Amino acid sequence: MKFEAIAVENIPLIHTGDDLPSIICKNLELQDRDIVIVASTIVAKAEGKVFRLEDITPGKVALEMASRNGKDARFIQAVLSLSREVLVEKPFMLVTTLAGHTCVNAGIDESNIEDGFLLYPPENSDASASRLGQELETLSGKKLSVIVTDTNGRAFKIGQTGAAIGIYKIKPVKHWIGEKDLFGKVLEVAEEAIADELAGAANLLMGEGAGGTPVVVIRGFDYYCEEETFIKEMYRPEEMDVIKKGLRCLQKRVE
């Protein structure tokens, strides 16, 4: 088995209201069951998720946090506005967002945007992936999957990798439970993070900084599905999330 990862070249700087599906189709002829992987930054820009830092007024909680961690209270307020729980305050803010994604700074980006502005992530990345996928299918006449990605750190390793934050017509997790291993033993715990693995592969071509390519197409890896899927299928249930439990205990001890 083999598959291709194709960087879609000549994607221009994206602004509010830009037609991403048309731009993608203009620069690459899509094929049936392609997986279109798109950086959340350009999805957010097209959706107008750009805000001036000077327009944000910090509240009491943001001001208190700023006094403890030395960050700009306006930036903290922006993070809090997108968060339902703060797990770590410093040296960075680790939060669970309103959408259920656990990440640094609620996914708010200060890079790849003009000074003095903040780029918020898509409000509902599954919905963004769905809109993008449906429009791409209409334009191309092909059956397609879409993954919206962001770069995430890892809890126990240095460095960032691509991670899926929104999906369309692709199952995010492959369950191997019940299958047999090389020695005939039945697998009892085996779940493969397909969407994250594909996001990581795409991130190798996307790159970072000024040379970034925000759209990559995976071709030849057929994981298309007709049913509706959601990124929350990848989130660990609260009762199983020992890292969050540990961070909450640590917070209580600090308080």
Curated annotation (Swiss-Prot):
It is an enzyme of class 6 (ligase). The keyword Membrane does not apply. Its EC number is 6.3.2.31, 6.3.2.34. Keywords: GTP-binding, Ligase, Magnesium, Manganese, Metal-binding, Nucleotide-binding, Potassium. Binds 2 divalent metal cations per subunit. The ions could be magnesium and/or manganese. GTP binds at residues 11-14, 40-41, 45, 112, 206-213. GO terms for biological process: F420-0 metabolic process. It comes from the Archaea. Pathway: Cofactor biosynthesis; coenzyme F420 biosynthesis. The keyword Ligase applies. Homodimer. PANTHER family: COENZYME F420:L-GLUTAMATE LIGASE, PTHR47917. Belongs to the CofE family. This is Coenzyme F420:L-glutamate ligase.
